[in-house]
């Protein structure tokens, strides 16, 4: 039986594949699908951010796509922000 952390990691992978698979390449999240993903899946995180500049920051190899490793940087950023919010009173 999967642990809570294993379930959470599976969900992260599933979200990535749901959007990266739109264009048929499960290893690349393209600009328009990235925009759709962040505005749908983490709207509070991106409400005051430019998705284009965020895409460029994450695309460290400059191939105009976000691979899974680059996507995990976004997951970390959102996780850190959510953790901070969880401690606000």
Curated annotation (Swiss-Prot):
The lineage of its organism: Eukaryota, Metazoa, Chordata, Craniata, Vertebrata. InterPro entries: EF-hand-dom_pair (IPR011992), EF_Hand_1_Ca_BS (IPR018247), EF_hand_dom (IPR002048), S100/CaBP7/8-like_CS (IPR001751), S100_Ca-bd_sub (IPR013787). Ca(2+) 1 binds at residue 33. SMART domains: S_100. One of its GO terms (molecular function) is antioxidant activity. GO terms for cellular component: calprotectin complex; cytoplasm; cytosol; extracellular space; intermediate filament cytoskeleton; plasma membrane; S100A8 complex. The modification N-acetylalanine is found at residue 2. It comes from Rattus norvegicus. Ca(2+) 2 binds at residues 59, 61, 63, 70. Signal peptide: none annotated. This is Protein S100-A8. Binds two calcium ions per molecule with an affinity similar to that of the S100 proteins. It is found in: Secreted; Cytoplasm; Cytoplasm, Cytoskeleton; Cell membrane. GO terms for biological process: apoptotic process; astrocyte development; autocrine signaling; autophagy; chronic inflammatory response; endothelial cell migration; innate immune response; leukocyte migration involved in inflammatory response. It holds the Pfam family S_100. It comes from the Eukaryota. Residues 13-48, 46-81 form the EF-hand domain. S100A8 is a calcium- and zinc-binding protein which plays a prominent role in the regulation of inflammatory processes and immune response. It can induce neutrophil chemotaxis and adhesion. Predominantly found as calprotectin (S100A8/A9) which has a wide plethora of intra- and extracellular functions. The intracellular functions include: facilitating leukocyte arachidonic acid trafficking and metabolism, modulation of the tubulin-dependent cytoskeleton during migration of phagocytes and activation of the neutrophilic NADPH-oxidase. Its main location: secreted. Zn(2+) binds at residues 17, 27, 83.
């Amino acid at each position: 039986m999967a642990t809570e952390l294993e379930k959470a990691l599976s969900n992260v992978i599933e979200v990535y594949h749901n959007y990266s698979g739109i264009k048929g390449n499960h290893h690349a999240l393209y600009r328009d699908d990235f925009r759709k993903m962040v505005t749908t899946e983490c709207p509070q995180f991106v409400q005051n951010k430019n998705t284009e500049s965020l895409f460029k920051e994450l695309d460290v190899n400059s191939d105009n796509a976000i691979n899974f490793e680059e996507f995990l940087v976004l997951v970390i950023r959102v996780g850190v922000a959510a953790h901070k919010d969880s401690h606000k009173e």
